[in-house]
């Protein structure tokens, strides 16, 4: 259901059209947040999900968070190394949830910027490079043809998070989670700490 809104460009140059597209994305994000808020009757939490390497990502999320103030509670972000995510989220008083595929990636994010806004870190989403459809990366030291078990990678992530005082922050296992029975040994596991699952 719904009404298709045609995308009509008025700009003549590529730059002008790009700016129009960003504004269109901002308006769309605000509209979606309002619809979700109304459908939920103001109950529950609404999170935005953005691809960091998308053109104009920072402008889009800044615009959406400004225009939908109080409606969005968290921002999940991956597809790249979203260094500025913590700063943007903190400025708008929302939690941030970076998507990483290794402890190494989180270490870089933490040291460069996340440590400055640690109180707004709502969780760390782990998407396994071999199970999550291949849209997240491996480092040059990892072999794409030799899958590693996600348990050891998440345990390494948790160990690193503990060294930063983040034992209370949940890890969200995402990508390749279809049956909770396959993950029973992860639940209430002291090595992994607080963990939740995103199915799919």
Label the model's feature ranges.
Residues 1-164:
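Active-site entrance/lid segments in N-terminal catalytic domains of soluble metabolic enzymes
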Residues 138-199:
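Catalytic alpha/beta core domains of metabolic enzymes, predominantly
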